[in-house]
């Protein structure tokens, strides 16, 4: 490789910065990777859910799964459960799990589900055993299984601050990442207009060939220096505020296998279970709900879900955000990753997976020469504009299908707020179920089966392609799911048992190492 782009400089730490440093250092060991971060700028750190992609990312970086689970106070995430999104009734609940539905043509599966259960049983519960496992707070794997493998597909719930610290330690100790704690006060460009060096408050400078902007919503490089514009998406995604709270839990309490998203009159609440606490937050639109009412909704939820907890003794962290993304993510020799690239409500935990996909795309096509920069940037920008459009569509899908009557929910169904691309897909899906042909990218963030779980979980009409009488193969597949559900429910440990046993083993191993 030419030495023209060997010096990679990352500005900003947190999950985005340190994932960038570690993944690029691991995938491109010929690079000289430097991360520059101010020592006194806090990270947002509320995104505590990952997709299954994080397993491959950790393996690539070289972080052991058991070490990650212990160091990051992490637990297993097997999907999301949505309560109250359809009509707000007591039994209004559906799952979007990570494991795909039973392997058979979806039109046949829908026919078998409808015939067998009359649509009284949940769609997800009929087509994947993951729901039986989640309902029982079970882990997706046994301790004896090889790392990063499981009986079911899974990601993680985690402490974002601890993940950043683990990545920083691993990157500097094992991957050769240089860590510079300093305030960036300016940027110098070369004669060709490309970024050339960062100017530090100390008077020093850090030179680079390629730069990654992980400065969060400040967007110091991609926004302030390069002037890349912002595409506002608040016309589609209304929520612009959140209250976040960390609620301690009693030792031995159950740990949920899924993120729980509970709808309220002007937004929704998240609930994420970790071994030592629950991360709970209230997402809302300031157009439809006051901050005081949001705090009351959050307090009422905590009181109802965690008896004995005193929400009045806990101060929520107040967040305001703009929904949207950069018009370009890559300009010249600078790539925006994380919040500097864009932000949308954390309804389906898209933040970390967008970071991972951005870094994968960069590592796969890292520039060797200045002449390649425009073409690589154009290709990257086209791909991630597509990905952002699909994320906006998928999150909007959750609102469009709701039948709730509050003004907020009625506004969400206003056709003027529904992207043309989503409206076209919904029309198509009245004819046939979502398929790979509808979502053509290789690394779709939300695949056809994700669309299916939300559509049929929320009561979308069965498509015209559904057969009037189910075939034998589809019925057999659903019977296999039922049997597999019983088998896994009997064989898998609870999340609490798995994680407590793992932490005890990690503690014992550390003590033995200290003695040795």
Set out the residue ranges of the language-model regions:
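Dinucleotide-binding Rossmann-like beta1-alpha1 core, especially the glycine-rich loop
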Residues: 46-134
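Predominantly flavin-linked oxidoreductase catalytic cores and closely associated redox partners
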Residues: 145-294, 359
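N-terminal Rossmann-like FAD-binding beta1-loop-alpha1 element of flavoenzymes
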Residues: 6-31
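Long, low-complexity C-terminal extensions of enzymes
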Residues: 364-516
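FAD-binding beta-loop-beta segment adjacent to the flavin cofactor pocket
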Residues: 318-336, 342
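Glycine-rich FAD pyrophosphate-binding loop
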Residues: 25-46
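Conserved FAD/dinucleotide-binding core of flavoprotein oxidoreductases
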Residues: 264-320, 340-353, 365
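Conserved N-terminal helical subregion
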Residues: 93-186
